[in-house]
Structure formats: structure tokens, C-alpha cells
Amino acid sequence: VPLRRETFEREAVYIAIGIKPNGHKEVIDYCIAPNENIEVWTELLQSMKSRGLEQVELFLSDGVVGMKTALAKTYPQAHFQRCLVHVMRNICAKVRVEDREAIMNEFKQIHQQANKAAAVDVLHDFYAKWNKSYNHVIRNLKDIEPDLLVFYNYPKQIRASIYSTNMIESFNNVIKRKAKPKAEFPTEQSLDTFIGIQAMSYNDRYFNRIHKGFGQVQDTLESYFD
């Protein structure tokens, strides 16, 4: 988001959205920083903990380096899922244009399986097919394999919502769209106020809505918490 400090700069806005076992979702916290780094994410996680968020069952994130370690320090019992959409984008950026469509279509099959065992088979077939052409890509994918299929450990009714960060991406798009007419924010306080208003509007909008699938498995999800 554009912000004027001493010069015109683009600020990183860190946003955490959560879904309760009953399916109610809300913006839990946010902060503004000059750039994205793990230290700020660590502070945000600690802020959420200090404000009363005692337990997290599943944490979904893009590929920020160190995020899993930071999460383990604040919420050691939380499980970590890497956003498969971000992983796919990263893969497509590293392969030849003529291979992108095939690779993208095959990678999408990973999150469309009936169970984790089938997804593992699809993933390993993906390795075997593309390893010769893109050894570095497959090697990197194998390094993060433990974080790719965690969402299969949860009820099938909610898996479509927990394999990617699309929920946050949608909120980010709202912020970008509404911020665009402003060109830039004159102060950090004005930007903070703007983000706060968008967060409250989001929370008001979804206060009594149950996210798709969660109502069907509420009892199961509640059993994961102390």
C-alpha cells in the first residue's frame, strides 16, 4: 500500500484472518511495516497470543522464510499448511512457458483427491514426470512436502478453504481496490486508520455468517481444542 514517509514508499500490511470452529471468520490482527520479514510476523503472532488467542489448530501461509519456526515458538501445537496456490505460482515462474499449462493442471490435481494417500501418489507422480527437466524445482518441492498436504488431515467439508490463502487474498484485493483512489497515504496513522476500518467492515459483514462446510463439522473441529 502506498505511504509517504520521508519519500514515497510502498508499505507491507500484515494481516491475520481466523476461522472459529463454528465457521465464523474475522480479521484477528494486522500491522504495517516497511517490508515483509519474519521478525514482524513473529511480533504479530506474539501480539495475538498476548491479546487472548491461546490456541491455533492450523496456520496457513505463503512461503515466507522462517514462518513455520516462528509459529512453533508462539503456538507449538499448531499445524502448518503451505498455500498450494503460492507454491504453484512459484513453480510456474521457474519453468519454461511451453510447460506451464501442463504443470499447473497436474499440480492442481494434488488438492482434488479424495484422501491424503491418493494426494501423495499424485505428488510423487508429479516428481517422477518432471524431475529430469526441472530437478531444482522438484528438489525444492520435496523440501517442503511435509507442509503441502496437512489440510487432508481435516474433514473433507472444509478442505477447499484450507489449502490456500485465497480468503486473505480476497481481503487484500478489497484493500487495494479501496486504497487505489487515494494514490498515497500522507501518514502511517492515516493508513492504520484505513486498514482498521476495512477490518471492522469485514468483521461486521461476516459476524453471523458460517463459512462453507464448517457448520457440518463443528463438533469435530471443536474436539481439536482444549
Locate each region found by the language model.
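Short, charged, low-complexity patches
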Residues: 37-41, 96, 100, 188
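RNase H-like nuclease fold core
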Residues: 1-60, 65, 69, 73-77, ...
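Acidic/histidine-rich catalytic cores and adjacent linkers
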Residues: 76, 109-226
